Structure formats: structure tokens, C-alpha cells
């Protein structure tokens, strides 16, 4: 089974990439609560094994993965249903580095080392600060969206990133795309078949 969670459309948003951090109407708190609610809903569905749920997210959704698995959030700590695996592609990790991160489950972070939108360094710091359940895979020369098939392009319309107001780069990196896809399949097989 697969459930695709849309935190934006029901709140009247089509995208948040061009919105400055701090002005977004859809927050990480809402996205975390959406994910926690989705776990509860999934657990109540016939044919769903609530002990075999994986949570995946990309970019802002990747940050939501971290929020939904951070035991430092009281609602996560209280959650009855938790995913067995969490995978975040190029998440923003700065907020979790500041507040502290305690993983509720096995967590895989996949990062581009050239990412100037959501840089890899804070995620590497987060993983290095002791969460024993966090694994990082990172690729040299890979930008945000490295698992895409399109070329790297500059997005001047994105106000956030390493150099605020100067835009960011986004696009595919064939080696990182292939390796991350295989890493995802391997992680899902390990987590969900035991």
C-alpha cells in the first residue's frame, strides 16, 4: 500500500518553494501533525500492518519526515503508531540541529553535497551528534533534486538557501539518482521484510 500525503492543497497552497521561510502558511508543525494523523489512519485500515509503515519525504517533505520522527516533539513522543523507517531526501536540517533530534526510528538521509538550497552540512551535523539510528548518504557534485532526470538549473525565484536572495540550483545527478534509488529500495526491503 502507499499513501501520498498532501499538506499543501487542502490549505490553499500549490507550492512553498518561492515563499520565504517564516512567511509560509503551511508550517512544519502542520506537516508533522499531518504525518502523525496519517499513521493513525493507516493503522485503522484493513490489510495494513501498522508495524510496517515507512515515511518518505523530499525537500520540505524531508524536513517533515524529521519532524514526524523527532522524539523531542511531545506529539511524536506520545504517538502510538510510528513508522519503522524514515527516509528524507535533501531535507532542511537546521531547525532539528537547533532543537535537538532524537530519532524514533531508523532514519536515512540522502543529501547532495553541492546543495545550495538545503545544505548537507546541518544534516551531517545532526547525524554526527549521536542519533544512533540516523544514516547519511551524500554525493559530491549533487544539488537539490539530484534524483531528478533533468539538468541542473538555477532558480532565481527561490528566496531561501545558502545565499538568500540569490536563488538556488536544482537538478539531476545520474550517479546520485541511481545510488539513492537503490539505497531506498534496499532500506525498504530491510525495514519492511523483517
Question: What is each model feature region?
Answer:
Residues 118-128:
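Short alpha-helix in the alpha/beta-hydrolase fold that links the catalytic acid
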Residues 26-103, 116:
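Primarily recognizes the serine-hydrolase "nucleophile elbow" in alpha/beta-hydrolase
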Residues 114-118, 144-145:
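Acidic catalytic loop of the alpha/beta-hydrolase fold
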Amino acid at each position: 500500500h502507499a499513501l501520498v500525503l498532501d499538506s499543501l492543497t487542502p490549505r490553499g497552497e500549490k507550492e512553498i518553494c518561492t515563499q520565504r521561510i517564516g512567511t509560509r502558511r503551511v508550517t512544519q508543525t502542520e506537516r508533522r501533525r499531518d504525518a502523525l494523523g496519517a499513521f493513525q489512519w493507516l493503522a485503522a485500515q484493513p490489510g495494513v500492518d501498522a508495524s510496517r509503515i515507512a515515511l518518505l519525504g523530499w525537500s520540505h517533505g524531508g524536513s517533515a519526515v524529521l519532524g514526524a520522527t523527532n522524539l523531542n516533539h511531545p506529539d511524536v513522543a506520545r504517538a502510538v503508531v510510528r513508522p519503522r523507517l524514515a527516509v528524507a531526501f535533501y531535507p532542511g536540517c537546521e531547525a532539528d540541529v537547533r532543537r535537538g533530534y532524537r530519532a524514533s526510528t531508523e532514519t536515512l538521509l540522502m543529501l547532495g553535497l553541492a546543495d545550495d538550497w538545503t545544505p548537507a552540512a546541518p544534516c551531517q551535523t545532526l547525524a554526527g551528534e549521536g542519533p544512533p539510528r540516523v544514516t547519511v548518504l551524500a554525493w559530491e557534485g549533487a544539488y537539490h533534486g539530484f534524483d531528478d532526470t533533468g539538468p541542473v538549473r538555477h532558480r532565481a525565484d527561490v528566496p531561501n538557501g545558502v545565499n538568500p536572495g540569490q536563488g538556488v540550483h536544482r537538478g539531476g545527478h545520474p550517479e546520485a539518482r541511481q545510488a539513492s534509488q537503490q539505497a531506498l529500495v534496499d532500506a525498504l526491503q530491510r525495514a519492511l521484510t523483517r
